Design a protein with these regions (language model features):
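An N-terminal JmjN-like helical accessory module and its immediate linker preceding a catalytic domain
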Residues: 1-34
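Conserved beta-strand-loop-short alpha-helix elements that form
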Residues: 138
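Active-site region of the double-stranded beta-helix
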Residues: 9, 31-135, 143-168
Length: 168
């Protein structure tokens, strides 16, 4: 696993996964998570809030979580053609359902906010790592991975879909 010391280096294209710890961003709290869920339910967000088995939650509408904005801005400053998507994943128990082994159609950066999530990454070797609060993990497009909540947890994913500039 490649370890970088500056969070900006996570946003640079690479074919390997990378890891970084950075406590300079204001942490997401359970209050932020509950407020986001409440707003999604009350406003009927689209795409809708997903409640998964065993108290797992996926929120595709995170505009109200202002603590994500400095990271979104850093992504856009570092990769100008990227307008990041942002999703909240919360597991209220350590047995919450996840997506299983899968790959994504875009690069993804995970920000572990609360609790611990075990990541299994299938590269040339299989890596397992327990991501803790304040840590970031970069997963390149097409790299298979799986997650398991070790404790109740909340994390934010930033999808780095490359969108070429549009000519007007």
């Amino acid at each position: 696993m490649e370890i970088v010391t500056k969070i900006e280096d996570l946003f640079l294209p690479t074919k390997h996964h990378k890891f970084c710890k950075d406590d300079s961003f204001e942490r997401i709290t359970w209050e932020d998570v509950i407020d986001n869920i409440d707003r999604n339910v009350c406003e009927g967000a689209f795409p809708p809030l997903k409640l998964r088995d065993n108290l797992g939650i996926v929120s595709h509408d995170t505009r109200d979580i202002l603590k994500t904005y400095p990271i979104r801005q850093l992504i856009m400053d570092t990769r100008p053609n990227i307008h990041p998507t942002c999703h909240l994943y919360a597991s209220l128990t350590s047995i919450s359902e996840t997506f299983g082994k899968h790959d994504d159609f875009m690069d993804v950066i995970i920000w572990q906010c609360i609790g611990i999530t075990r990541w299994t990454i299938y590269d040339e070797k299989v890596y397992q790592y327990d991501l803790k609060p304040g840590e970031f993990l970069y997963i390149p497009m097409g790299m298979f991975h799986d997650t398991t909540p070790v404790t109740p947890r909340a994390s934010i994913s930033f999808g780095l879909e490359n969108r070429p500039p549009v000519a007007i």
